Amino acid sequence: MAGLAPEGSQFDARQYDAKMTELLGTEQEEFFTSYDEVYDSFDAMGLQENLLRGIYAYGFEKPSAIQQRGIVPFCKGLDVIQQAQSGTGKTATFCSGVLQQLDYSLVECQALVLAPTRELAQQIEKVMRALGDYLGVKVHACVGGTSVREDQRILQSGVHVVVGTPGRVFDMLRRQSLRPDHIKMFVLDEADEMLSRGFKDQIYDIFQLLPPKIQVGVFSATMPPEALEITRKFMNQPVRILVKRDDVTLEGIKQFYVNVDKEEWKLETLCDLYETLAITQSVIFVNTRRKVDWLTDKMRSRDHTVSATHGDMDQNTRDIIMREFRSGSSRVLITTDLLARGIDVQQVSLVINYD
């Protein structure tokens, strides 16, 4: 459990950073963890029966590597740092830990989860609700672009878990619509992305409004200095789990690398792929919003039907585009990596990292 600690008193960030550097440079180890217990099945984790029902109903059969190591320490109330790439099962890890610890007879917010984007927050809400379907969990997403009054109404009626973006969550706390008195779990998902988007001050402001003894989970693809600073200030002897990037591969997914000597040849190669392969739906990742617009125009000029979404678009437009893509009426989506962290579309058969 963590309170706001004096800098450097709770967590040796330099030791952690040095160990990560050492691990990333070796081929002998796949994981660095300060928690030795590994559970090969969900049944062995001591989870509530109705939580297990939700996990299996959602489609999970066997825990991923990070779930084998990360669910139980979170369920025990320990502070946890988990560093791994998207797609490794981090979301289900902290959702399971939260759902295991809730007091369902108390309809008050007991867990607060922050995410960098509206799309990701809504995706987490969906997973939390699905895994907790047999537990009767009440979850609400507090995100920008939605009605403040509706947020206030739902929060005042009572929820167990709030998932949201830092700006809207802080606003709800400031308005006293979100009462922090019973919050015992605080999760930062995609912490590196939140910090890169300038949410550091809001995260600190939110933490100051929470009870002094609170469990903290930090989940991130990378651990930049700003994220390590958060671990020092907020966390108490956290369990640390790092999965090497090279070891993050998902079963059933084939990965290919196309060596293109010149930047201008990428477009030709991309169009060749779409003319050669039978693709159900696909997502193309690019690094910038400007690149989204450029690639969309280029592909449309070559008679490819594509949709595009990025952070400069208004929220209603983004919602419409995502609904069309999920329904299958749009087959190709061009987007930035950050927005893509909230995308979950079962029919996608091809993912292209353009940059």
UniProtKB/Swiss-Prot annotation:
EC nos: 3.6.4.13
Keyword Nucleotide-binding: yes
Job of this protein: ATP-dependent RNA helicase which is a subunit of the eIF4F complex involved in cap recognition and is required for mRNA binding to ribosome. In the current model of translation initiation, eIF4A unwinds RNA secondary structures in the 5'-UTR of mRNAs which is necessary to allow efficient binding of the small ribosomal subunit, and subsequent scanning for the initiator codon.
Cross-referenced InterPro entries: DEAD/DEAH_box_helicase_dom (IPR011545), Helicase_ATP-bd (IPR014001), Helicase_C-like (IPR001650), P-loop_NTPase (IPR027417), RNA-helicase_DEAD-box_CS (IPR000629), RNA_helicase_DEAD_Q_motif (IPR014014)
The species this protein was found in: Nicotiana tabacum (Common tobacco)
Example GO molecular function: ATP hydrolysis activity
GO CC terms: cytoplasmic stress granule
Enzyme class: hydrolase
Name of this protein: Eukaryotic initiation factor 4A-13
Motif (Q motif): 40-68
UniProt keywords, alphabetically: ATP-binding, Helicase, Hydrolase, Initiation factor, Nucleotide-binding, Protein biosynthesis, RNA-binding
GO biological processes: cytoplasmic translational initiation
Helicase ATP-binding domain residues: 71-241
Family named by the database record: Belongs to the DEAD box helicase family. eIF4A subfamily.
Binding site for ATP: A84, Q85, S86, G87, T88, G89, K90, T91
Membrane-spanning intervals of the chain: none
